Amino acid sequence: MSNNTLLLGAVAYDPKVVLIWDGFQAYFAKQGLRFDYILYSNYERQVAAQFAGQIHVAWNSPLAWIQSERIAAATGRKAEAIVMRDTDCDLTSIIVVRSDSPVHAVADLKGRRVAVGAADSPQATLIPLNFLGAQGLDPGTDFEVIYFDKLPGKHGDHIGGERDAVRALLRGEADAACMIDGNHLLFSQEGVIQSGTTRVLATTPTYDHCNFTVLDGAPGELVDRFRDLLLDMSYADPSIRPLLDLEGLKQWRAGRTEGYAALNQAVNRFGYVEPFVRQVAASCG
């Protein structure tokens, strides 16, 4: 892999991903940064590719960050979250019930059915299920978990699983549904949720979402230039605003990792990533 061009990996969860990275590629070229990207069908393939030295930077989901951090620890390497979006910070997930539901407290979910998104979705599955577990309800034991496992490997970036979970709730096939709070608003705007038909039962603690991940050994000058160009972007600049809108942000921020505590707890509870971590770590030997 050439160290003259910064090579980024991203997951193709939606056709707009090509528009986004073609746009950023053109912008970076105007700023003198040689940049290219590779699209992957799933985050596990992307994480493995980064540890195989095939990309310098990965645009990672929160679960892919946890995977990368743990593989790095297992192999004596260092992973760093260098940049994230303003919209990646301080998010919450919610557990929603129908307005006429007899469920008025988390404890009332015992013996009932909870619909979630994809099994690997931090926001629609792992974090809310861990939250319910911390409230004394063991998922799969104290209540039935109904998975809507759309596009595994995309870590819930494709929100179809959350949308299907809400529809199951509204049809009476589930007693509660889990989703990121922003999608509750989106589903209302789409007409999936009619006004007054649902209410929020509980809200998780805040957590963070995606970040750009680099490993030790990445070309420092290129990474620093990439980071500086991102952090210098202004939403007031009409040449870059459409790309920021597509990527869902108004400002890039320096990366931080304290916002992944809730997901780390969920991963520890469910043991979700350990087989993959061991597999990639072994391949690095």
Q: Language-model segments: which ranges?
A:
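A ligand-binding cleft/hinge motif common to bilobed small-molecule-binding domains
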Residues: 59-74, 133-134, 163-195
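Secondary-structure junction motif
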Residues: 117-133
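Short helix-initiation/N-cap motifs at beta->coil->alpha
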Residues: 37-48, 140-167
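Short, glycine-/small- and polar/acidic-enriched structural segments
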Residues: 2-103
